[in-house]
């Protein structure tokens, strides 16, 4: 009996460690990916208010950062499933220096930038925050005015 219990517990530990945060720790309706949990919020907020909203969940939460095409595809499917309205969605990328130097709010590396054709353009010298675009299936990005009201995608470590 003792040996069976030990083997069972060991298998459970291995199973949970293989799954990591991808299934065990995210709240309901959040997407587990890469050790983080992601949620799209239907509240319309400007970029700064959206970032502050994400940070209020717990320390270390931010607007989402994306680092691969696989991330973009996964988030595209998730946003399409959970976004109740139409519209572009804020992510955590912006150009704070206004010199085409794009930075993530979580300070992760900027290694993936699937811009829409002719973007970014800083149109009218007003567009410094980044949204994922609905008419591209949320697979491409556009810079927009940080004051525009959008749904947004948060990422948290749980």
From Swiss-Prot:
Glycans are attached at residue 134. Ca(2+) binds at residues 119, 121, 127, 142-143. Expressed by the venom gland. One of its GO terms (cellular component) is extracellular region. PROSITE patterns: C_TYPE_LECTIN_1, C_TYPE_LECTIN_2. It is found in: Secreted. Residues 1-23 form the signal peptide. Residues 33-155 form the C-type lectin domain. Pfam families: Lectin_C. GO terms for molecular function: carbohydrate binding; metal ion binding. Disulfide bonds join 26-37, 54-154, 129-146. Keywords: Calcium, Disulfide bond, Glycoprotein, Hemagglutinin, Lectin, Metal-binding, Secreted, Signal. Galactose-binding lectin that binds to and agglutinates erythrocytes in a calcium-dependent manner. Belongs to the true venom lectin family. This is C-type lectin galactose-binding isoform.
């Amino acid at each position: 009996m003792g040996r069976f219990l030990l083997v069972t517990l060991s298998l459970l530990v291995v199973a949970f460690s293989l799954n990591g945060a991808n299934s065990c720790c995210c709240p309901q309706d959040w997407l587990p990916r890469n050790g983080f949990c992601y949620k799209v919020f239907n509240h319309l907020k400007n970029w700064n208010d959206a970032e502050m909203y994400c940070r209020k969940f717990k320390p270390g939460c931010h607007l989402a950062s994306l680092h691969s095409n696989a991330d973009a595809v996964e988030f595209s499917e998730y946003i399409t499933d959970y976004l109740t309205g139409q519209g572009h969605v804020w992510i955590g990328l912006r150009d704070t220096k206004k010199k085409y130097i794009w930075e993530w709010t979580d300070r992760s590396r900027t290694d993936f930038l699937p811009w829409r054709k002719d973007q970014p353009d800083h149109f009218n010298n007003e567009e410094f925050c980044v949204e994922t675009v609905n008419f591209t299936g949320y697979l491409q990005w556009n810079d927009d005015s940080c004051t525009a009201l959008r749904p947004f995608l948060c990422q948290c470590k749980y």
